[in-house]
């Protein structure tokens, strides 16, 4: 059986959770036997690049669309992808960036189309800041793919509910919940001499004190990640708490400016505020997470949040917003705490009472910081939950079973 995976991100060009998901899914599916082909953005992979494997094809944007709206350039890549999926038994697309390629492949070659829902355009209206009129185009591409897909994979129960609410014409029996996963062999505490030496280098380079209680945020600077709410909540944390922000790749100039101002204000009021704006390799991120006390996910929209699984794999308690798929990951009072939130129903996820949300967030972070023993127990429980509930082997087999049911 030949399976073609269609994706915006694939090594060496991985920017977020969807890229991590496709990379790991392709790896485990190959081990289960199918012929896996990967079609990705960002051009052909060069020999020696991570991701330069047999069956991986990268596409450049069409030169004729140079300077056009970003969403239009995306559809140009999608059409190239669809031209090269002939001969497959099934196409599986990830995010709106590749969904149109899956839809066109289904029409051209009469093969099943599976869509994985990592996010939903109707629940990200702030994308209009980034794409302008292209947001209407991205929304169209997603809607037509979802309404015509043979199966939709939701990465959490919260995401399934969001799909059915956002696209009422989609029948519930077409939506299957298969979680994101985590590779515990990759996400682990530094143990070898080389890893510990690298950790010492990383901590020194960024000025991180391993002996201070530390709160860590990891994520892109986007509206959905909710970083401004955490930066305001951080004013209520103990003065000895160190705040490490692994935050970069802002969606827009507006959100970048807002975060920059809030970080400067926080740093002017207290010491121990560390901003790391570049994307870190996994080993460096593990080095930082290893000395953390608690991980924070202040998102106002989060289908699941692979970063939560990464933090749990590093034995960290997680404090996250009670929204989207986060409650599928965090067990309240056992692996961390859920922050209550009342949100506007206009699709933005904006808290109705931002100050109450920020205070509730600070309260739960402070509860972890105040009890190091309980924090360690939560971290151990989180690791065990990651091991038993979010194994890539399990997720790969569930996905392959769905493929087989569709192909027959």
Which residues make up each language-model segment?
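N-terminal subdomain of nucleotide-sugar transferases
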Residues: 1-47, 408
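A conserved mid-protein helix/loop that constitutes part of the nucleotide-sugar donor-binding site
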Residues: 20, 213-217, 222-236, 257
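Nucleotide-sugar donor phosphate/pyrophosphate-binding loop at the beta->alpha transition
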Residues: 111-112, 122-144, 161
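Carbohydrate-associated surface elements
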Residues: 158, 181
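Nucleotide-activated donor-binding/catalytic signature segment of Leloir-type glycosyltransferases, i.e.
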Residues: 256-279, 283
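Short alpha-helical donor nucleotide-sugar binding micro-motif in glycosyltransferases
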Residues: 286-292
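Aromatic "clamp/platform" in nucleotide-sugar-dependent glycosyltransferases that forms part
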Residues: 300
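Short hydrophobic beta-strand element within catalytic cores of glycosyltransferases
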Residues: 317-320, 330, 337-338
């Amino acid at each position: 059986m030949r399976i073609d995976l269609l994706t915006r991100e694939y090594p060496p060009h991985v920017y977020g959770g969807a890229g991590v998901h496709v990379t790991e899914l392709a790896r485990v599916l190959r081990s289960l036997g199918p012929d896996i082909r990967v079609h990705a953005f960002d051009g052909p992979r060069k020999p020696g690049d991570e991701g330069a494997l047999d069956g991986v094809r990268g596409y450049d944007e069409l030169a004729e669309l140079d300077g056009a709206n970003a969403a239009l350039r995306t559809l140009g890549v999608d059409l190239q992808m669809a031209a090269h999926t002939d001969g497959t038994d099934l196409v599986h697309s990830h995010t709106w960036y590749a969904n149109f390629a899956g839809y066109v492949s289904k029409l051209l070659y009469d093969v099943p189309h599976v869509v994985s829902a990592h996010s939903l355009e109707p629940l990200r209206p702030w994308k209009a800041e980034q794409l302008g009129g292209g947001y209407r185009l991205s929304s169209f591409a997603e809607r037509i793919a979802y309404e015509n897909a043979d199966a939709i994979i939701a990465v959490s129960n919260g995401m399934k509910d969001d799909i059915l609410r956002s696209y009422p014409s989609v029948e519930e029996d077409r939506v299957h919940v298969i979680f994101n996963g985590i590779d515990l062999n990759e996400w682990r505490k530094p143990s070898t001499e080389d890893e510990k030496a690298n950790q010492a280098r990383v901590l020194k380079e960024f000025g991180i004190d391993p002996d201070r209680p530390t709160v860590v945020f990891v994520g892109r600077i986007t509206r959905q990640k909710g970083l401004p709410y955490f930066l305001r909540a951080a004013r209520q944390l103990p003065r000895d708490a160190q705040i490490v922000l692994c935050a970069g790749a802002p969606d827009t100039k507006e959100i970048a400016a807002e975060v920059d101002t809030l970080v400067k204000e926080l740093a002017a009021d207290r010491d121990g505020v560390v901003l790391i704006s570049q994307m870190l390799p996994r080993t460096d991120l593990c080095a930082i997470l290893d000395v953390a006390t608690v991980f924070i996910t202040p998102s106002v929209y989060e289908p699941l949040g692979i970063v939560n699984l990464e933090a749990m794999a590093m034995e960290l308690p997680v404090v996250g917003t009670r929204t989207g798929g986060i409650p599928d990951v965090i067990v309240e009072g056992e692996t961390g705490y859920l922050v209550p939130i009342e949100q506007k129903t206009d699709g933005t996820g904006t808290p109705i009472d931002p100050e109450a949300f920020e205070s509730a967030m600070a309260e739960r972070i402070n509860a972890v910081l105040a009890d190091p023993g309980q924090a360690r127990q939560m971290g151990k429980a989180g690791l065990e939950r990651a091991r038993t509930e979010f194994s890539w082997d399990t997720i790969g087999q569930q996905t392959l079973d769905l493929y087989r049911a569709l192909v027959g």
